[in-house]
């Protein structure tokens, strides 16, 4: 059952000023969120882009989170703040109806005798918790998870079903790990002996800070000697690969299907778009934005926006451009020849 909150509680939670219309009070109850177009009685919506102002004027929402410049266009109660999208996120947290990944400790879970469990820990059916593991207060371990030897999981961290944490992995507080993610598998470390690959045991681990979120089916490899480190507040989308010995700075965001090769250091507050490939053994400074489909082959030491992806165009135009690209070296040589003849 969804919880309800009053408009005043909601305004206090998100840091907004409350403007009431006739018939509403600070005690008017809100039970859920919806879009401007579909919201109704007891629901709250938001407007963060003035392009949707026409929907604001017609909405049947109980209240709307918006900027002060949009207040005059609102026919219902309003929660006014500078960043309505952040307000929406905070309101969604308050009204979150997402279930727990586990309730209580299932009798079907396999838990080693020396595991340290904090208060209110939940472990789902068929989860395996190996020796030396420490689970802090309010940790949720979903069904089918594997928690390897000497893993440490911080308070309020939640693992959805079928997450794997290899031995000695460390997760901080308030982390969220989505299903089928693997943290702490071996990094891709091999030496070549006359054509034969010799495996290098990966002796480091993976350390996640506080408030780290990792999407479904992502992989973060353990370090070869030093550790792979994911800083506080980092968010990683689905199906990403983070190789061994990578260091990711605080509050960096990485979108889906991105690959970060080994021994890369990414700074703080970076945004990495989807399907980006980052070559190994390089540094990316703080406050860098890399657009989707880019390939990063050298270090970035200056904050800013970087791109190298090829946007889609009509096939006929692309084929013409491909022919021109194939002939580029010939055209370049012809230009040089013409320049030399002109100088004579």
From Swiss-Prot:
The active site is at residue 244. Gene3D superfamilies: 1.20.5.170, Hexapeptide repeat proteins, MurE/MurF, N-terminal domain. One of its GO terms (biological process) is lipid A biosynthetic process. Keywords: Acyltransferase, Lipid A biosynthesis, Lipid biosynthesis, Lipid metabolism, Repeat, Transferase. GO terms for cellular component: membrane. Belongs to the transferase hexapeptide repeat family. LpxD subfamily. This is UDP-3-O-acylglucosamine N-acyltransferase. The lineage of its organism: Bacteria, Pseudomonadati, Pseudomonadota, Gammaproteobacteria, Alteromonadales. The gene is lpxD.
């Amino acid at each position: 059952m969804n919880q309800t909150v009053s408009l005043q509680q909601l305004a206090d939670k998100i840091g907004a000023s409350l403007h009431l219309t006739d018939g509403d009070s600070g005690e008017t109850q809100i039970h859920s969120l919806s879009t401007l177009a579909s919201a109704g009685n007891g629901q709250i919506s938001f407007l963060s882009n003035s392009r949707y102002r026409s929907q604001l004027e017609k909405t049947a929402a109980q209240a709307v989170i918006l900027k002060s410049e949009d207040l005059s266009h609102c026919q219902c109660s309003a929660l006014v703040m500078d960043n309505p999208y952040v307000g929406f996120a905070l309101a969604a947290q308050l009204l979150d109806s997402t279930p727990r990944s586990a309730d209580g400790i299932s009798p079907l879970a396999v838990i080693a005798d020396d595991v340290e469990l904090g208060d209110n820990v939940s472990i789902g059916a068929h989860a395996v918790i190996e020796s030396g593991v420490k689970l802090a207060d309010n940790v949720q371990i979903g069904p089918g998870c594997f928690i390897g030897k000497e893993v440490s999981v911080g308070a309020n961290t939640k693992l959805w079903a079928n997450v794997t944490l290899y031995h000695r992995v460390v997760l901080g507080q308030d982390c969220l790990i989505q299903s089928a993610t693997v943290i702490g598998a071996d990094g891709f470390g091999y030496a070549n002996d006359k054509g034969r690959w010799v495996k290098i045991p990966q002796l480091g681990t993976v350390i996640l800070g506080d408030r780290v979120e990792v999407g479904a089916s992502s992989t973060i490899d353990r370090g070869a000697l030093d550790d792979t480190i994911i800083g506080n507040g980092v968010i990683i989308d689905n199906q990403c690969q983070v190789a061994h010995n990578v260091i990711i700075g605080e509050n960096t965001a990485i979108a889906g299907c991105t690959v970060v090769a080994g021994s890369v250091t990414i700074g703080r507050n970076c945004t990495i778009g989807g399907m980006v490939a980052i070559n190994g053994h390089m540094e990316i400074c703080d406050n860098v934005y890399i657009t989707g489909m880019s390939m990063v082959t050298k270090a970035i030491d200056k904050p800013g926006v970087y791109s190298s992806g090829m946007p889609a165009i009509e096939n006929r135009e692309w084929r013409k451009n491909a022919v021109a690209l194939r002939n580029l070296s010939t055209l370049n040589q012809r230009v040089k020849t013409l320049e030399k003849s002109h100088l004579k």
